[in-house]
Amino acid sequence: MKQMKILMIVTGTGMFPDGKQETGLWLSELAHMYDSAKKRGYDIVIASPKGGDTPVDPTSLKTMYMDKLSKEYWDDSEFRNVLRHTKSLDEVSGELFDCIYLAGGHGAMFDFPDNTVLQTLIKDHYENNKVVAAICHGVCGLLNVKLSDGQYLVKDKKVTGFSWFEEGLAGKKKAVSYTHLTLPTNSR
C-alpha cells in the first residue's frame, strides 16, 4: 500500500502588524495533527510561506493551553528542529500530497490569505480530489482560493474557524481587525 504524504502548512509570521505583540503558530494545532500522522506512518512535510523558522505563539506555550502531547513535542529537540527548518511553499509547490493541512495561530492571518503560491497549492489539491483541511485561524488560507472555474473554493460551503467573539475573549480584537483580509464578496 502506498504511503500517505501530508503537507502541514504553518505560519512564518511572528508579530502582529502593530509590532507590539508576538504571535505565530498555535503549537497544539500542529502537534496533535503531526502526532496523528506520525503514528500512522505518513510522510510528513512541514512548510511555511517563506520557509525557515516557525515562530510559535508564546501564549500557546502557557500552562493553561499546553496539553500533555503538545508539551511532549515542544520538549522534543527533533520536532523543534523541524519547526526551525520548514520548507518554503515554493519548494513544495510542484508536489502532490494526499492531504494539505493548514495549522492555526494568529500569525496565519497575516501570511496565508493573500499568498498566491498557497492558493495554487490548495486549488490544485482540491481539484485533484485530495483532502484540504484547516483549523482555527488556518482557515483564512482558504478564503481567497479561486478554482479553475473562477469560483471561490469557500463559495456555498460552511467554514468554521476562530470567531470574532473568541477574538474578544482572547483580547485580540484590536490586533486582528480583519480589515486587512481581502474577503471575496461572493464567498459569504
What are these regions (language model features)?
Residues 24-38:
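Short catalytic helix/loop segments, enriched in acidic residues and glycine
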Residues 99-104, 118-145:
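Catalytic nucleophile loop
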